[in-house]
């Protein structure tokens, strides 16, 4: 049985669509979801990641949720190994694995059997020290000097990925992209469906989504996570919403001023997601406005059946 993947930008309704698919298939086959959202890996990061609550999951098993403490570093390599094991275990018990998420590298690592270059802690530490010394913007310029393509694909604010790219270039003598997978037949023959909306409509959805996060207590969630080490987290503290709230709190605010930069940052991230996923010719795209969740789920199932 071929797995199903539902991918696309943030805020498009992928999680709800997966549940609707599970509901329509419930009389025929069990469905289990494998999360492909990097920040939903973290325990306690619920409101700012729009993570479904246990009640909202309606009894559908979800994997790769709440598997890391905020002090732990999320890595694509670790996720790839753990999520692949989940997919294969789900299929082995006769259920349908449905991979759901929009974290671009995580999705690709799972579907394209990405091989990751080795890491050297000494080299990594040296570049991390360099980052601390000169700052993320200057280090991004240094990456551009040795690997212009990598610099063009990595945000100049993403210090962790800049360090990793410089580490790979130094260790392999090759461009960072040389370690990336080429798009071929997806692993396990996975059927990939993309969900998107018109840009104007999605921007409105993102604004409502951001407002709702702050209304539901994102600031309190961040404050609570500070007590368990959020500030020490390499990846968790940089998550959209969390980073903006932290910055406002550090500036003496109460966190409420983080709403607008969170929305702007999310909208910018969505543009990157859309550009990334639209390059993948294997994805069959659906318009989120083309019917309710049941109608969209029916389309997804028909696409899956046609290929399977």
From Swiss-Prot:
Keywords: ATP-binding, Magnesium, Nucleotide-binding, Transferase, tRNA processing. GO terms for molecular function: ATP binding; tRNA dimethylallyltransferase activity. It is an enzyme of class 2 (transferase). The keyword Aminoacyl-tRNA synthetase does not apply. GO terms for biological process: tRNA modification. Its EC number is 2.5.1.75. Substrate binds at residues 10-15. The keyword Magnesium applies. Pfam families: IPPT. Its cofactor is Mg(2+). The record marks 103, 124 as: Interaction with substrate tRNA. Signal peptide: none annotated. Monomer. Belongs to the IPP transferase family. Catalyzes the transfer of a dimethylallyl group onto the adenine at position 37 in tRNAs that read codons beginning with uridine, leading to the formation of N6-(dimethylallyl)adenosine (i(6)A). This is tRNA dimethylallyltransferase.
